[in-house]
């Protein structure tokens, strides 16, 4: 079983974190933004659902932009200047979250797409007929 990654205190503590990793998971239904330090310990996180969006509005680009802004605001206050971005998933919020991260003033060392792609693995679900 995977060990849980320990969390670094509360969101408001005064730890200085100069460099970190921003993980963006964009599904069709929601966008989750997690900011970790370089060792993988969670510093801050936010999602479209925690920002007050409900139902189908959680999957929108504006909701992803708001979630990314909320997650990054706390780490900018803790002194983060440089970050790497890992984007996962096919959702609409991918570009909007990246735009919000770029606008925050953090220098991005690289942006990597880590969406899992099957090499002809499991059979996909049947196509929807509406």
From Swiss-Prot:
UniProt KW keywords: Chloroplast, Plastid, Ribonucleoprotein, Ribosomal protein, RNA-binding, rRNA-binding
Pfam family, one: Ribosomal_S11
GO biological process, one term: translation
Residues forming coiled coils: none
GO cellular component, one term: ribosome
Cell compartment(s), UniProt: Plastid, Chloroplast
Record-linked InterPro entries: Ribosomal_uS11, Ribosomal_uS11_bac-type, Ribosomal_uS11_CS, Ribosomal_uS11_sf
Domain of life: Eukaryota
A GO molecular-function annotation: rRNA binding
Listed Gene3D superfamilies: Ribosomal protein S11
Primary location group: plastid
Annotated HAMAP family: Ribosomal_uS11
Subunit structure: Part of the 30S ribosomal subunit.
Family of the protein in this entry: Belongs to the universal ribosomal protein uS11 family.
Full protein name: Small ribosomal subunit protein uS11c
Lineage of origin: Eukaryota, Viridiplantae, Streptophyta, Embryophyta, Tracheophyta
Encoding gene (name): rps11
